[in-house]
């Protein structure tokens, strides 16, 4: 997958998060979870774009780590929406699956970048 394709997936994820947040009930819990999810679910795309423009490999890894952290937080909020039955699981399942896939992709990218850094540090 190219970085442009990953950016598109992250932007699509953010757009889907926005739609989910807008569909949450207007309750104290719905507003709280919605606020948290909109922040964590929309930040991975710009954080990944920043990583692509990193000034060093260490900066790249750091920015990817922030992206992964936000995706993992989003995953927790999505799971809570499912557990509390705020929205039907069939509606949330695809979003949760995409979040898991994005977490795996970013985590693998971090591992690869760290290995490359170790190789360059040894030479």
Language model features: what each stretch is:
Residues 1-123:
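Short, C-terminally biased terminal segments at protein or domain edges
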């Amino acid at each position: 997958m190219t970085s442009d394709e990953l950016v598109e997936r992250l932007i699509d994820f953010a757009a889907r998060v926005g739609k989910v947040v807008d569909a949450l009930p207007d309750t104290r819990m719905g507003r709280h979870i919605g606020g948290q999810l909109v922040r964590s679910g929309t930040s991975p795309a710009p954080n990944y774009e920043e990583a692509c423009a990193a000034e060093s490999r260490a900066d790249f890894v750091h920015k990817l780590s922030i992206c992964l952290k936000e995706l993992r937080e989003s995953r927790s909020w999505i799971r809570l929406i499912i557990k509390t039955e705020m929205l039907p699981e069939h509606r949330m399942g695809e979003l949760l699956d995409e979040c898991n896939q994005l977490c795996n992709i970013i985590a693998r990218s971090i591992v690869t970048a760290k290995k490359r850094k170790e190789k360059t540090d040894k030479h």
